[in-house]
């Protein structure tokens, strides 16, 4: 709606003055009118998509959250954040498939849920390699206790100086695999054995991820436990 556009215009001007090169936009619900006359959901999506495009032109990269990534919005966005890499957790589900990555990898940047608000960091690093998703952190310069009564009250640990080493280590681990498949699409995803998956990309590069606590051997291929191997054809 026009109300949303006005809010964004004011913020965009301030961000441009601060020389910010990229933003993440949390978009309103498709039918929200912000005090304007009621409009249809389709028209609202149209206006929001236009706002994303204009913000990108003024500020730089614009990212949206996965659960707000409608086709109209994604057409103007640089990428998606908060990519969920979990199954629905129903008891009859045994494996997860990187559906979002299969659809979008190669056409836009994909980022994980914020790692400093989640557990199981070792497993999540492997998941990011399997899914072709880069790490994301929710960070502050100062101690987050100052945000206790704000919209960011959930940040228990976010100070950059506390997380710097973990950020560098995580990025290095993930980038070690994904640097070979930048801009490529996923063409195949298969389970080689329990806890071992292979993802193949359009440039014929395959990444084998081993989630188990023992080495995976197949001919000349050796994948250490809790690690991955990149196979270049």
Region spans (language model):
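Active-site-proximal substrate-binding groove within the catalytic cores of carbohydrate-active enzymes
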Residues: 1-233
